[in-house]
């Protein structure tokens, strides 16, 4: 029987099991199965996945994230805010501004601290990727993929594709509560045009500075929030002429609000909370 200490944290209800790999050891070959086991709501702790906080050669810390199906993702906005909180509060970093390595690249985090606790984290998510090769999508072309039709159940849905280090398909609807989240979501997620699968967002524009947001996450299904998805939604809204670049947009997710801005300089900034749920020790056994 093996075990490791963990901290369960959430960003707007998007919860992960966080493991400090500066102190813990999980064999590389076991990571996918451990992520699946620990995320199981019935036989594990229950979460949207597992995130490892690891040493890095190019930044103070490195984030590796695994979905609850065991697949490894390249980035996670809500996860990055929680990693920033953990790293600062556990003295893995000294300054309130620092970098975090991800499989999608290096991002910059800035934490707001009150009485030694991080109350808010802002992440510079970098520039969005908009070509088919960068997303990735099948097909050729260097222009952004904006409002292309997808036929499902005799209805045409127009989506815009954006990568924030992971792929997103953003669909505008009149009412997110009536959106085909659990039906169209998994169909588009696994469509052959997306070789690495895709996260699917449904967006309801409220005004020039607010939107409602629901998400079907690649490898996790319906979740309360998706930070990279919120970033992709704002980028897609600006590409479609629905919002103005440079303004801070309030994204209303099922779990709460994020503040997102696509700056004139090109990067996307995400600001929001990160919370600790509980801490403990998880025991597991890998069958031979």
UniProtKB/Swiss-Prot annotation:
Where mainly found? cytoplasm
GO BP terms in the entry: lysine biosynthetic process via diaminopimelate
Q: Which residues form the active site?
A: 76 (proton donor), 226 (proton acceptor)
- Name the site position(s) for Could be important to modulate the pK values of the two catalytic cysteine residues: 168, 217
Record's keyword terms, sorted: Amino-acid biosynthesis, Cytoplasm, Isomerase, Lysine biosynthesis
* Residues the entry annotates as binding substrate: 14, 67, 77-78, 166, 199, 217-218, 227-228
Keyword set includes Isomerase: yes
Q: Name one GO cellular component term.
A: cytosol
Q: Where in the cell is it found?
A: Cytoplasm
A molecular function annotated in GO for this UniProt entry is: diaminopimelate epimerase activity
Q: Which reaction does it catalyse?
A: (2S,6S)-2,6-diaminopimelate = meso-2,6-diaminopimelate
- Family the entry assigns: Belongs to the diaminopimelate epimerase family.
Q: How does it assemble?
A: Homodimer.
Question: What task does this protein carry out?
Answer: Catalyzes the stereoinversion of LL-2,6-diaminopimelate (L,L-DAP) to meso-diaminopimelate (meso-DAP), a precursor of L-lysine and an essential component of the bacterial peptidoglycan.
Q: What is this protein called?
A: Diaminopimelate epimerase
Provide the species name.
Bacillus anthracis
């Amino acid at each position: 029987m093996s075990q490791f200490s963990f901290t369960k944290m959430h960003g707007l209800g998007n919860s992960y099991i966080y493991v400090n790999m500066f102190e813990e050891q999980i064999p590389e070959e076991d990571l996918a199965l451990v992520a699946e086991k620990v995320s199981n709501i019935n036989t594990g702790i229950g979460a949207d996945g597992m995130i490892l906080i690891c040493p890095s050669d190019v930044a103070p810390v490195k984030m590796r994230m695994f979905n609850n199906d065991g697949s490894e993702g390249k980035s996670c906005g809500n996860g990055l805010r929680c990693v920033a909180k953990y790293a600062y509060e556990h003295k893995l970093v000294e300054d309130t501004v620092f970098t975090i390595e991800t499989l999608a690249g290096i991002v910059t985090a800035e934490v707001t601290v009150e009485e030694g606790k991080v109350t808010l984290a802002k992440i510079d998510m970098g520039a969005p990727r908009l070509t088919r090769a960068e997303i990735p999508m099948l097909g050729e072309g260097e222009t952004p993929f904006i409002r292309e039709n997808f036929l499902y159940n005799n209805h045409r849905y127009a989506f815009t594709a954006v990568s924030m280090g992971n792929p997103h398909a953003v669909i505008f609807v009149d009412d997110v509560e009536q959106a085909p989240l659990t039906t169209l979501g998994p169909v588009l997620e696994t469509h052959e045009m997306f070789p690495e699968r895709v996260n699917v967002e449904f967006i309801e524009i409220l005004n020039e500075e607010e939107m409602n947001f629901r998400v079907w996450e690649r490898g996790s299904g319906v979740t309360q929030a998706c930070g990279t998805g919120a970033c992709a939604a704002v980028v897609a809204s600006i590409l479609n002429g629905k919002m103005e670049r440079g303004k801070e947009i309030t994204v209303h997710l099922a779990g709460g609000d994020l503040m997102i801005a696509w700056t004139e300089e090109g990067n996307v900034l995400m600001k929001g909370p990160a919370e600790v749920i509980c801490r403990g020790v998880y025991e597991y056994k890998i069958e031979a």
